Amino acid sequence: MTAQLSKKSEAWSARFNEPVSDLVKRYTASVFFDKRLAQVDIQGSLAHAEMLAHQKIISQQDHAEIQRGMAQIQEEIASGKFEWLLDLEDVHLNIEKRLTELVGDAGKRLHTGRSRNDQVATDIRLYVRSEIDNIVGLLRDLRLALLDLAEKHADTILPGFTHMQVAQPITFGHHMLAYVEMFSRDAERMLDCRKRVNRLPLGAAALAGTTFPIDRERVARTLDFEDVCHNSLDAVSDRDFAIEFCAAAALIMTHVSRMSEELVIWMSPRVGFIDIADRFCTGSSIMPQKKNPDVPELARGKTGRVNGHLIALLTLMKGQPLAYNKDNQEDKEPLFDTVDTVVDTLRIFADMATGITVKPDAMRAAALQGYATATDLADYLVKKGLPFRDAHEAVAHAVRACVDRGCDLSDLTLEEMRVFSPLIEADIFEVLTLEGSVAARNHIGGTAPQQVRLAIARHRSKLN
């Protein structure tokens, strides 16, 4: 029986009296998605092997053999020659099996003092840390593209909306800066998340630590972790760092989705504020005239996908007792797809920002149609000494009269305006222009072109 059992392919098969069914193998295997972790798995294994040799847990010769074997495995993976086997379950055992084929007993000694539990936790942290750095860089690229667009249109009038109704005039540059602010916070969130990702689980072993005289701090230094995880149970069992990453990613996509909604609306022929370059649009298989903003529409849709992954991970963790459970195998596909979706979306949006054509005349015409300067008239009366609530009421009556007549506030004569307040004088016509309205909001965070340019300069300084 012993000889028969020793032929089984699983690393743990000696405990069992019968082989695992093929159905169970397919159901429990993760290698065809977690092989994405191959490079970080090798990176972690090399650091672990170096520590084992330094601590004299394995010999220097074994260490050299492990390094040699891992170098060949990396080449095989890069060239597509590495054979991934479902029978070996996951990325870890596939690599370990190949290493043993290449270097013999030295490969069998690599797993001394560790478990797949702390191994995979380390792999995921290395992976997430790397992707955070990548995403922060892509957020920078997107912000720079939006800053270019904002700078080009720092003076371009755009109607600002609340409740999808014209509210007050702003500039297109100011509007773009709102998204720059959102994506700046997204980058800050990612970097803050990185602090909690950047802790080393390796050395926790299965759940209780190891009896070998390991040096966890040495491995942490080798892998550029700021610290080690200080409780072995927590180190192998929790995925809160991945959940936090997915939450930050969901916020990125939420901001992208809000921008997408506006781009779709603005590109509509009924609105016509912008056009998006043909290379970011598609047509219809039946309607020859169509030019559809598929990229922002799809980004809007993919946001729900990323939100779903966040909920999946939260649900995955909520019922697990300590320590590691097989449930955690399900953390990878939502995590990987979140990364892919966010990375692809940020890349294409930074590119698409260069293909947005703004139509100032359409924006200006829309700003003239919704009594956008009504608040300016109320502020004018307040500055003349009228309490704000009284000023608000007077202007509301004026707007009502304009609605009935089908004209704008600026179309009223001075005499007609004075019907609503005797405080109104000839200087009111400077106040009621769109340019005058935006220029008057000349403070930090305001829409005045001067402030827009100062804000752009501040952001560029931070990004550079």
Curated annotation (Swiss-Prot):
GO CC terms in record: cytosol
Protein name: Argininosuccinate lyase
Organism the protein comes from: Janthinobacterium sp. (strain Marseille) (Minibacterium massiliensis)
UniProt cross-references to NCBIfam families, sorted A to Z: argH
Localization terms from the record: Cytoplasm
Gene Ontology biological-process annotations: arginine biosynthetic process via ornithine; L-arginine biosynthetic process
Gene3D superfamilies (alphabetical): Fumarase/aspartase (C-terminal domain) (1.10.40.30), Fumarase/aspartase (Central domain) (1.20.200.10), Fumarase/aspartase (N-terminal domain) (1.10.275.10)
HAMAP family, alphabetized: Arg_succ_lyase (MF_00006)
Keywords: Amino-acid biosynthesis, Arginine biosynthesis, Cytoplasm, Lyase
Catalysed reaction, written as an equation: 2-(N(omega)-L-arginino)succinate = fumarate + L-arginine
EC class: lyase
EC numbers for this chain: 4.3.2.1
Family: Belongs to the lyase 1 family. Argininosuccinate lyase subfamily.
Pfam families, per the entry: ASL_C2 (PF14698), Lyase_1 (PF00206)
Disulfide bonds: none
Pathway where it operates: Amino-acid biosynthesis; L-arginine biosynthesis; L-arginine from L-ornithine and carbamoyl phosphate: step 3/3
Gene Ontology MF terms: argininosuccinate lyase activity
Taxonomic lineage: Bacteria, Pseudomonadati, Pseudomonadota, Betaproteobacteria, Burkholderiales
